[in-house]
């Protein structure tokens, strides 16, 4: 059993580049608005892009870590429990202070903001030998979150505006504030008599279009109805399992990998009839709401419709929850089968060791998504592997 703790401080140059703001930078005017007239001729001038800041420094990154390592019963059970935190100070930001236009340049970036990343990790392992078969199993799960300690917040106009802003001091980062899908219009009566106004409707609203919930109940769907729907960028949980076995030179190993509490935006894929810049395959194009007869008038309330996955002509409100999908998954990343030839077979050939093996990658994926690779960052995320 081992108990450990550590602390470290280092400089972090992430995002700082070469600090061009430490010197005055100029740009050539291309609009003919800045310059001087000499002998009746306009001479193009240059303008300062920012006031220099010679006091910029790297971020300061403080890292804290504590953990417990254990190994029991001669290695039959081992594991690690760990918690960690990284606090960064001096992140670059530009002050919102107002300066007169006569200054002729914008304010420079300063070391103003701070944030932290924190989380935990648990790993467990087991190995044994039973009746000549040796095997091992290792599992790992971790959770990570990001949080602003201090963010240069602009002044909110009211409490609602402060509520749905993402980058606010003391709040976790990367929260998706958006409109919650309530369903789909299936006929013109639903469109005509729906009990909300605002963003749910437009002149082109048709059966098959999505509608969004009036979250605050004021009868109007607008920015005040946005609320936390998901997180993005980092999964809440990452996990993996590796296992293997060996018997008389035959070995089999596999590696499973997954994530949970992770969301991606597939606006184009789920809300447009012709995704991928109009290059969608025919099956995607035809699986949409459409009139029974191609010549029927879609604006006639008596027209009959055939339902499908996609709206008839797409939906302008693609920023709602319709395109945001839970991309939690577990995937068989690698599978390998091998055989190590006995050394007695190899001596005469002068070979010390010889192992023959076959392996495969990304054989199986279990996820709630259909036809989309959950590891794809979003947008054009069609998958070419087996999805269950």
Per-range role (PLM):
Residues 17-19, 113, 129-233, 273, ...:
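Conserved small-residue
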Residues 1-171, 319-388:
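Extracellular/periplasmic, surface-exposed regions of secreted and cell-surface proteins
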């Amino acid at each position: 059993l081992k108990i450990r703790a550590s602390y470290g401080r280092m400089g972090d140059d992430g995002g700082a580049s070469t600090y061009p703001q430490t010197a005055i930078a100029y740009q050539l005017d291309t609009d003919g608005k800045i310059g001087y007239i000499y002998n009746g001729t306009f001479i193009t001038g240059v303008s300062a892009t920012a006031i220099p800041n010679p006091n910029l420094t790297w971020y300061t990154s403080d890292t804290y870590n504590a953990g417990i390592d254990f190994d029991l019963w001669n290695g039959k059970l081992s594991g690690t429990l760990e918690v960690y935190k990284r606090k960064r100070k001096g992140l670059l930001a530009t002050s919102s202070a107002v300066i007169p236009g006569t200054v002729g340049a914008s304010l420079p970036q300063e070391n103003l903001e701070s944030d932290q990343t924190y989380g935990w990790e648990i790993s467990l392992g087991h190995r044994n030998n039973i009746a000549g078969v040796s095997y091992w199993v290792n599992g790992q799960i971790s959770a990570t979150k990001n949080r602003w300690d201090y963010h240069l917040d602009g002044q909110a106009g009211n409490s609602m505006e402060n509520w749905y802003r993402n980058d606010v001091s003391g709040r976790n980062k990367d929260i998706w504030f958006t409109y919650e899908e309530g369903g789909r219009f299936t006929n013109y009566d639903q469109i005509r008599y729906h009990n909300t106004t605002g963003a749910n409707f437009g002149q082109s609203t048709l059966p098959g279009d999505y509608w969004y919930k009036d979250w605050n109940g004021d009868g109007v769907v607008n920015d005040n109805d946005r609320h936390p729907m998901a997180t993005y960028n980092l999964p809440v949980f990452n996990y993996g399992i590796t296992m293997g076995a060996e018997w008389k030179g035959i070995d089999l190993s596999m590696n499973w990998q997954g994530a949970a509490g992770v969301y991606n935006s597939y606006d184009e894929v789920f809300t447009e009839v012709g995704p991928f810049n109009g290059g969608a395959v025919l099956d995607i194009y035809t699986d949409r709401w459409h009139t029974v007869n191609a010549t029927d008038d879609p604006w006639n309330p008596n027209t009959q419709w055939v339902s499908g996955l996609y709206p008839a002509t797409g939906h302008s409100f693609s920023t709602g929850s319709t395109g945001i999908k839970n991309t939690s998954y577990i995937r068989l990343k690698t599978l390998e089968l091998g055989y190590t030839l006995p050394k007695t077979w190899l001596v005469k050939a002068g070979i010390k060791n010889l192992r023959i093996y076959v392996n495969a990658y990304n054989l199986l994926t279990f996820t709630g998504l259909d036809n989309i690779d959950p590891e794809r960052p979003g947008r054009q995320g069609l998958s070419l592997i087996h999805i269950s």
